[in-house]
Amino acid sequence: TTLSTSLETKQKIFAVAKELNYVKKKRVTSAPSCRIGILQWFSSKQEIEDNYYFLMRQGIEDYCSKNNISIVRTFKTDNDYQNVLSDVDGIICLGKFSKQEIKLLHSLNNKIVFLDMTVENIEITSVSLDFRQAVSDAIKYLYDLGHRTVGFIGGIEQLEDGTIFPDKRLNTFTDICDELNIKYDGFIIQDKFSTSSGYKMMSEMISKGNLPTAIFAASDHIAIGAMRALQENGYKIPEDISVMGFDNTELSGYTNPPLTTVNAPV
């Protein structure tokens, strides 16, 4: 059954409502339970280039939305980020920060959590993701497909003060390869977490004239760049060489061929 209201009927309703001084009730919404600041160490452009941190932030924001928690978001590159975070109930620092920055941020608010890095200060809560199981499953999957030489292309994160954060996936990669007797010597290259870096690293490996039978990339964006470099040089995927990504981003389903990828524990 379809119910419809004619224009004439609507006008009558509005007229009566006006006579009765009817005021439409506003939807009652409860005030936010608290206000959380999210400080990102990377720029919006970097977030687009590497979805790893985007997925983390999205998870935080989804949780806050469901639990009526207000969010204020700022970047470490913003000149006024300290002022922005001065009146929040707590802070989540997303990414990598120097010891001086950690000390400064803790002085702003002692209710603070650092996500994706380990902080030595026992008074500060930090959460570092464990990639070991995901990487182990990926390499064993390639092994079961018959691959005995596998390359690794990943990224290195570096702060302004020169502090370097190596890719945590690499140690697990070499450990599992050693366990399975998979060769990787000469097939490890690290640069940045971006599509252009993936293209650059894969091109460098191709130029050496000797390729492994499979490539494990530390992110989907790196893998997509690597796929383009391979295809431009006449290699067919997966007939000539297999490529596996990491992060399970939506973009991985739109490559040609679709990218095999690992779901990151984000």
Could you tell me what each predicted segment is?
Residues 1-32:
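N-terminal helix-turn-helix DNA-binding module of bacterial transcription factors
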Residues 64-75, 170, 174-196:
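Short beta-strand elements in bilobed, periplasmic/extracellular small-molecule ligand-binding domains
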Residues 138-180:
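An alpha-beta-alpha
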Residues 33-140, 206-207, 221:
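Alpha-helical recognition/docking segments in bacterial nutrient-uptake
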Residues 37, 87-94, 151-154, 188, ...:
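Periplasmic-binding protein-like
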Residues 127-153, 195-204, 223, 262-266:
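Hydrophobic alpha-helical segments within soluble ligand-binding/sensing domains
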Residues 201-266:
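Flexible loop/turn connectors
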